[in-house]
Regions:
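Long C-terminal interaction/binding lobes of large macromolecular proteins
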Residues: 1-179
Length: 179
């Protein structure tokens, strides 16, 4: 006779950028261990892989981390962490006045929210005829950044990967066609 299988509780979250409801479960001890090993490795790609695997597993495959906006990935990860480890996080923040004093602070992860301001748009007018249409960065965009290069080059690399289209009057140039 087989042992009974323990079921994890399930919760629902709303993906900030789409409003889509996604069911998720807390991460398990073995998944937390994968995260800790990735963190100890100090290898960004190993950390990204661990986050990708964890989010995919805990959302029952409903969230594709490769295509979801980075802020959605961060939000989902924080919600997973809140239900798995604890909703409160204690931090010692460095006081900006003297850069020496540490201030203990508690943050309730369930109260965190993504704020997309009123009038937010993905369009950047360059001239009266030319408009750039942007997309949010993804985890894959962040992975491809050359960490050994200058910070300025990294920023331009992210910006370049976030260009979706350029509109010049009636002509539309897709990112794929832009060199």
């Amino acid at each position: 006779m087989a042992l009974p299988k323990l079921e994890s509780p399930t919760y629902t979250l709303e993906v900030p950028s789409t409003g889509e409801k996604v069911k998720f479960r807390p991460f398990l001890v073995k998944e937390q261990k994968i995260l800790m090993i990735a963190e100890e490795s100090k290898d960004d790609n190993q950390i990204y892989d661990a986050m990708e695997t964890l989010i995919s597993s805990c959302t029952f495959g409903k969230v594709d981390v490769k295509t979801v906006n980075l802020f959605d990935v961060e939000y989902i990860f924080l919600q997973l962490r809140a239900k798995s480890v604890g909703e409160m996080v204690e931090l010692n923040l460095l006081c900006p006045d003297d850069n020496k004093t540490r201030v203990p602070t508690k943050i309730d992860l369930t109260k965190l929210d993504v704020d997309i301001g009123e009038g937010h748009t993905d369009k950047i007018p360059l001239t009266s005829n030319i408009t750039m249409h942007m997309k949010y960065p993804t985890l894959d965009n962040i992975r491809t950044i050359d960490k050994k290069g200058s910070e300025t080059n990294s920023i331009f690399s992210i910006l370049k990967s976030c260009i979706h289209e350029v509109h010049d009057g009636d002509t539309i140039y897709s990112r794929i066609d832009i060199s």
